[in-house]
UniProtKB/Swiss-Prot annotation:
Gene symbol of the encoding locus: priA
Catalyzed chemical reaction(s): 1-(5-phospho-beta-D-ribosyl)-5-[(5-phospho-beta-D-ribosylamino)methylideneamino]imidazole-4-carboxamide = 5-[(5-phospho-1-deoxy-D-ribulos-1-ylimino)methylamino]-1-(5-phospho-beta-D-ribosyl)imidazole-4-carboxamide; N-(5-phospho-beta-D-ribosyl)anthranilate = 1-(2-carboxyphenylamino)-1-deoxy-D-ribulose 5-phosphate
Record lineage: Bacteria, Bacillati, Actinomycetota, Actinomycetes, Mycobacteriales
Alphabetized Pfam families for the sequence: His_biosynth
Name used for this protein in its record: Phosphoribosyl isomerase A
Pathway(s) the chain acts in: Amino-acid biosynthesis; L-histidine biosynthesis; L-histidine from 5-phospho-alpha-D-ribose 1-diphosphate: step 4/9; Amino-acid biosynthesis; L-tryptophan biosynthesis; L-tryptophan from chorismate: step 3/5
EC number: 5.3.1.16, 5.3.1.24
Coiled coil: none
InterPro entries according to UniProt: Aldolase_TIM, His_biosynth, HisA/PriA_Actinobacteria, Isoase_HisA-like, Isoase_HisA-like_bact, RibuloseP-bd_barrel
Amino acid sequence: MTSVNPSSSKPSALILLPAVDVVEGRAVRLVQGQAGSETEYGSALDAAMTWQRDGAEWIHLVDLDAAFGRGSNRELLAEVVGKLDVAVELSGGIRDDDSLAAALATGCARVNLGTAALENPQWCAKVVAEHGDKVAVGLDVKIVDGQHRLRGRGWETDGGDLWTVLDRLDGEGCSRFVVTDVTKDGTLNGPNLELLTQVCERTDAPVIASGGVSSLDDLRAIATLTDRGVEGAIVGKALYAGRFTLPQALDAVGP
């Protein structure tokens, strides 16, 4: 079994984070983050356990109901984290002290803030200062008329200019950014390498790539950016759709 060690001294090894996006307890994938575009892939716990069995060292676990503000899967996500032996990055609807405390209490390795970083900058700065490496910030980007705009609340609202927000968060000491081109996510149309490169040029914090991965060649292309600051890649629909297996992906980007 080939795996990627996050603590490896070899900078070329890209960390892969299989995604488990959860709606009403089920693993789903969306197209461009649109509510109602779900394709269901069964139990969230079964999906997560499958990726662990196949060699994942990280899982990207997302509560889409909480992200869209239409409920939550809090108890289920806590159960999933508790049953996994691998590190979990937990995302979706973490916007205040209560939801943050619940997320951290699951024992996850890291939480991913999204909307909160856009709508409540002071709270976000406090959380980043208090929790350091346990907090990443998701930058969900939609390029509109050449402008890089951030999207919030399940990608339904405008969250301002990417570069302005990135500079602010970087100055506040954010330890890691998860960068998604929302026009690519769930489309299997390939990642936005230019966007990833541009973000890496603006921050020394590690970057996790998300959205558009459709092939092993896409992963290899992202892996060429590790020396620029791309640390990992979230892989979702390509795995669920059988474009490649996780062991194949780990082998493609491993040391």
